[in-house]
Amino acid sequence: MKKLLILGANPETVSLILKAKELGYYTIVTDYDPHAYAKSFADQAENVDAIDSDALIELALREHVDGVLVGVAEALLPTYCEVCKRLDLPCYSTVDKFGIMARKDYFKQKCREYDVPTIKEYRYDELEEGCYPVIVKPVDSCSSKGIRICYNKEDVENAIPYALRYSKSRKYLIEEYMVGDEVVSYYVMQEGTPIFVGMCDRYTYKEKGDLVQLPNSYIFPSVHIDSYINYTDAAVKKMIRGLGLENGSLFFQCIVDKEGIARIYESGYRLNGAQEHLLISRVSGIDVKKLYIDMAVNGKVSDLDLESMANPKPLKLTCKLSPLVHTGKIKSIAGLDEINRLPCVVSVNPSYREGDIVAGEGTLKQIFCRFYIVASQKKILKDTIDQIHNLLSVKDVNGQEMLFGLFDTSIIDDRY
């Protein structure tokens, strides 16, 4: 049995581990945290720090691994590249390309070079009364960490040190704070060919004034998909080719402006923590997890013609529902088994167990679970989400309900 070494063991890595096991591989997962969530799903769990390349090499040689994978943690990509290179194992890209796509400032510069619509930036000394509100963020962080919305210069002065706390390079970005629909577009690359595979509407809930909005639902296909295909897709594909991104997957977070044009502000050149691949595989047969696994072992993502399989405008509605919870310690969780038995629910991916502590207010750490739904009609989708909301309960040590900001299903009637 061939062995795969998977770097990082956060909850979002579980689906990758399960897919590798389904395909017949022996899975070794490593993370410095001995209690990391995904470890219990692997065949073998190690406590080697996934940024310690020397220790990872030693582990890989000792276990005679046949391929190396990284889960969803962007910070592990440079180590992943080094480990693959030193072991002479396939790697889906290079450190310099990961660096461009992971650094928000570098990435946005490439967007401008290739005429990809993006969001206006400001230097600190350019800020004037008419610029506000703006958003301050680290150039090299993810999962909504280090981000603040600012309504005046004093807010900006307070937000900059906060952003720098989450920036390895000690750099920040100031952008126009756009109000509009949020969308996410998805691509896979096969031997240099970029393939548009899906696009969703990203719905969010905003709890406090200076905190960013957190996603509580993604719905495919996006109501803006035709506009995206007409105004943005060609430029994005040109950029992907120009940057030499040969294999793997990409996601782009965008805001739709008043003219209906999707403006890209962030990218991810990896498996997405939102795990939209669980839905895209259901409507197209393209399973991004399998592409990464095949690349790790065989050096190519697929022998299939992925472009002919792509189905970015499926007839079915699909949804990633991600209920939010307040910070605190979880005492009890109810409803997951019943939800898992609902006919349209194709996957249930919790982030926490009873006894876990939810920290990181205003970040994606407040997502309690991700539910994946495939429905043939919008009424069925709406009813399924309402059922999930009614069944699910997460209570803290004081017996208080921790769930908040649930997705408003009336939106489905209004927009789809």
Task: Pin down the residues of each PLM region.
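A glycine-rich beta-turn/hairpin centered on an aromatic-Pro dipeptide
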Residues: 301-343
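A structural supersecondary motif
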Residues: 250, 263, 339-356
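A conserved helix-loop-beta module that forms one wall/lid of the active-site cleft
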Residues: 85-146, 153
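Conserved ATP-binding module of the ATP-grasp superfamily
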Residues: 117-119, 133, 147-181, 199-200, ...
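A short glycine-rich, hydrophobically flanked beta-strand micro-motif that places a catalytic Asp/Glu
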Residues: 175, 246-258, 304-307, 403-408
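Short acidic-hydrophobic, aromatic-tinged amphipathic segments that line or gate anion-handling sites
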Residues: 45-51, 121-124, 150
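ATP-binding N-terminal substructure of ATP-dependent carboxylate-amine bond-forming enzymes
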Residues: 1-97, 299-302, 308, 313, ...
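ATP-dependent carboxylate/phosphate-activation module, predominantly the ATP-grasp catalytic core
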Residues: 177-179, 187-245, 249, 256, ...
